[in-house]
C-alpha cells in the first residue's frame, strides 16, 4: 500500500490497488454481449476496472478491523458481475461502486490470520439483534441490510463502505472474523465462507 500526501495539507492518506465494479449500464451490456464469445473481452470492456484509491473509512463504532487479504476466492456471483449476467434484483441491496471479493483469508490488524464471514448483519451495522440468540444475519425482513452505519450491501464484496477482497485492504467487523488454525492452509481457509 502506498502512502500519498494529498493537497497542500500534511494529511496522509492510504492508497491501495483494487478491482472495482462501477454502475455503468453500458459496460454491463458490453460484458453481457461479449461473455459468450470471450470472457477475457467481457472482463476487459465490462464494469470492472483497476483503481488506485483510498482504503475504506472505518465506521465510528466499536469492533472494526482493517484486514489485508492473503488470498481471495472468485465466486460465481463475482463472475456473473464481471460477465454482465448479474441479476438486477439485488440492486437495492448493493452500494456502487464496490470492490468484489467475499471469500477471504486475511491478516488482521490485531495480528490474527482470519477468515471472513461476509454477511453484513445487525452487529456490523450497529443495529440490535431481532431476537435473543439471533445469528449475525438473522431477521425476517432483511431491512437491516440497508440500515445502520454502513451503506446498503448484503455482504462484504457488495458494499461500498467495507471494500472487498479484490483489494489490498478492506474493513471487517469482529463478528465477521474467525481465527484460522495454524494447521489450515490459506488455500483451505479461503473456502470456508
Task: For each feature predicted by the language model, list its residue ranges.
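Alpha-helix-centered segments that form part of catalytic cores
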Residues: 140-178
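Active-site phosphate/pyrophosphate-handling residues
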Residues: 80, 103, 190
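Glycine-rich beta-strand-centered segment in the early N-terminal region that forms part
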Residues: 55-72, 87-144, 176, 181-183
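Short N-terminal strand-loop motif that marks the start
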Residues: 2-100, 168
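Hydrophobic residues at beta-strand termini and immediately following loops
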Residues: 53, 170-172, 180, 192
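A glycine-rich, Thr/Ser-enriched phosphate-binding loop motif common to dinucleotide/cofactor-binding enzymes
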Residues: 160-167, 184-193
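Glycine-centered small-residue hotspots that permit tight backbone geometry or close packing
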Residues: 73-76, 157-159, 193
Amino acid at each position: 500500500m502506498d502512502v500519498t500526501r494529498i493537497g497542500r495539507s500534511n494529511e496522509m492518506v492510504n492508497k491501495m490497488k483494487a478491482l472495482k465494479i462501477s454502475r455503468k449500464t453500458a459496460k454491463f451490456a458490453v460484458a453481457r454481449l461479449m461473455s459468450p464469445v470471450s470472457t477475457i473481452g467481457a472482463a476487459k470492456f465490462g464494469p470492472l476496472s483497476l483503481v488506485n484509491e483510498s482504503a475504506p473509512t472505518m465506521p465510528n463504532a466499536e469492533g472494526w478491523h482493517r484486514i489485508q487479504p492473503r488470498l481471495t476466492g472468485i465466486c460465481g456471483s463475482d463472475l456473473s458481475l464481471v460477465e454482465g449476467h448479474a441479476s438486477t434484483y439485488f440492486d437495492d441491496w448493493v452500494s456502487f461502486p464496490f470492490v468484489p471479493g467475499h471469500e477471504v483469508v486475511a491478516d488482521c490488524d490485531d495480528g490474527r490470520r482470519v477468515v471472513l464471514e461476509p454477511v453484513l448483519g445487525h452487529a456490523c451495522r450497529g443495529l440490535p439483534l431481532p431476537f435473543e440468540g439471533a445469528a449475525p444475519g438473522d431477521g425476517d425482513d432483511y431491512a437491516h441490510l440497508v440500515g445502520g452505519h454502513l451503506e446498503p450491501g448484503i455482504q462484504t464484496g457488495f458494499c461500498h463502505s467495507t471494500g472487498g477482497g479484490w483489494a489490498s485492504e478492506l474493513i471487517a467487523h469482529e463478528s465477521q472474523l474467525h481465527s484460522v488454525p495454524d494447521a489450515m492452509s490459506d488455500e483451505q481457509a479461503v473456502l470456508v465462507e
